[in-house]
């Protein structure tokens, strides 16, 4: 309840994992100041432990990354980092380093964290940031592990999850079954994204209504009235249902086990019995009971995890997807081991845990569309390389990108943040000439103009931030550009001269800047996307042999791509 009230009243942007907002910012969206604000960081830092201790089926990797990224962004306010704050590219690199640090500090995954940060950026990543990210992630990982060792009074500086799958954990015939598991989990990941999207639509439509038929309009000015909204009541109900299902005398015998321990248990190399060290009562008598218990576990966990993901509290989904994937893979592995007790070849029995690892990799990769998620998983479990898991992750990403979009992209689309995502610019068939504004409708200035003409020009409504300067309106040779605000300031300075002498009509040469970036009308939109993403531009002039023929704006690209995607979806 503490986390719910704190998030709802103080920082609503602290809900969820926060990774979608980070991706939107890294893809050029402006105006999302609350996503990486100090207020959001503090609220998330205080509410995340409360949500985790409440027993809700959520993870902490995404929120941890969000907290560290907020810290990295707010560090730029100090004078020490002033040079970084003034450079757009370095500011972006600082945020990407924050992603790597958050992942490394939370999971001890240095390589996976850096790669995840690179994938979260979008299509284009500055390779010069690799060393910085690896260095920051290594320091974060070492510090986190050493502090963990100090708290637990042990001498092990590195902590990985207790997963022991002794190689070789599979034979060649088993690769076909692992392929089947990967394909199934890929579609499950797509289903997770789709269901989450529909639940968010419902929450947005009905979540802010108040307790059914009761009217609270007269209390609308009171902030506390937000606690009577349906989304708040729904959160309390989900918490109570989760607590009820975790009761030890019912299915809580295996549902109540924490996130990491249950994942370790599902990847046990031995059968899931208490004799072998299992904490959950998966098997009480006959070995075949494991099929019933795991089936119940998957069903309940899947439903509650999806419902919990859309609650207005801090929390991620990565750990829960690992658990759901591992449980399905374990179920398939146990089935094969039951049918083929000796395996496909002598002295090579089937290891159900290996199927769990493959399924977990496929499900997380399908939901995030990030191949780096498998490296995070392998670092967590202490496995440097597991070929079936790598293959499963690749299958998950390919199928998901073919049929759907990632969990982060759907939030960006749902919130209608103006981000140009890489999934919408894969085709070279879309050219700049289809989305640009032609010169006939552009406000332009000649390089030599009178104050009176400049004043009349500035009276035009909806002027762009940058005005093109041409040699004359017949040749339209682009000679530079001028900032609208600077032009307005210059005119205001010279305006008294014009008012004191109405006949003053001397032409002056406008102080202009060069246009370092221009493109042609046949430039593919994917290349224009590169310019807007990496250089953080709002608009670019389109020229042909030095002649101004138009201007393309970031908003026009977003509108065109949105319309094309909508048309494709309707078809």
Predicted regions, residues:
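Alpha-helical transmembrane segments and immediately membrane-proximal extracytoplasmic
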Residues: 1-473, 478-479, 483-498, 504-513, ...
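C-terminal accessory/binding modules appended to enzymatic or scaffolding proteins
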Residues: 512-513, 517-522, 527-531
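Short alpha-helical Gxxx[C/S/T] motif in the catalytic ATP-binding
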Residues: 554
